[in-house]
Every structure is written in structure tokens, then in C-alpha cells.
Amino acid sequence: MFSFTKDIGMDLGTASVLIYIKDKGIVLNEPSVVALDKNTGKLLKVGADAQAMLGRTPGNIIAIRPLREGVISDYEVTERMIKEFLHKVMGFQLFKPRIIICVPSGITEVEERAVIDAGIQAGARRVYLIEEPVAAAIGAGIDITQPEGHMIIDIGGGTSDIAVISLGGTVVSASIKIAG
């Protein structure tokens, strides 16, 4: 069946953002950095281009990491960063994509809502969330629907998540703010 929309997977990490497009694989792997003109608020660069500016900018240009410890610390900048990355990998699209975004297992409902809202405002038709250990297990080819426990450890740039997964869900999990 032909689909007008794209399905996108996004790892919105503290250190980097990865974007996966169905049938294409990983199409973006860039640092979670945004360069802004602090006088005007204008977004100048995102990702690797913004990271290259760290420590090398005049006083009116600042480089920001809008995620801290696995969650959004600057909502508006995160939304703009997601929008730029989506435009970079998709160009202009008549139909909005569905996006599944990885989140740490221990985030609050408010933090979940912020991720969903940022994705919608950035141009997604629908945003789904998946816990990082579950996404890691699926990515590793583990059949998480089986009645077997699998311990998964996901060490990211802002959090480390540990979970036992069985029968399609998380049995127990912990997320700590210590990471690589």
C-alpha cells in the first residue's frame, strides 16, 4: 500500500539526535546543539554546524544544548532544533510524518508532554513515545513479546537506563542521571 507520509524514529538525546526513516535506515546523526543570536533570538545553525561554533563565537552568538539529563531543558529551542532536523532529512512535505521518540524510562508526565508537544509543534502529525531500553532491545533484535526476561542497559549522553523487559513491556526499570 502506498503511503503519503513517512514514519520516523527519533532518539532525542542529550548529546546527539539520531533520525531513522523506515526503509532508509539512520539518515541523521548530529549533536544536540543549537546556535542562536542572543540579541534577536534567530536560529543560526543546528547540529554539527552549531557544535563547530562552540567557543568560537562573538558575544552575541550563543551555542545551547537544549536537553539536559535526558529531558528537555529549553522547550522552544528543542522544538526549533527538531523542526530543523526534520526539514534537513525530509525537505518540504505536504503530509506530516508520524514520529516515535525515545525517552528515558524515569521521566515524568510533564516531561513526556513536553516531548510530545515539541514534536507536534515541530511538524509531526502524531508523536509516540518509547522508553529507551525498549527501543534498544528492539534494535538489538530481541523478541520482547516472549515470556523471557531480558535485562537491557542503555547508557546515553545524559542518562543511563536499566530495565528488565518481558511480554512486550517493562517489568522494572531505573533511570539515573549519570551517563557517558
State what each model feature region is.
Residues S160:
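Metal-dependent DNA phosphodiester-chemistry modules and their immediately adjacent helices/loops
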Residues M1-I155, A163-G180:
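Nucleotide/phosphate-binding catalytic cleft detector across ATP-hydrolyzing
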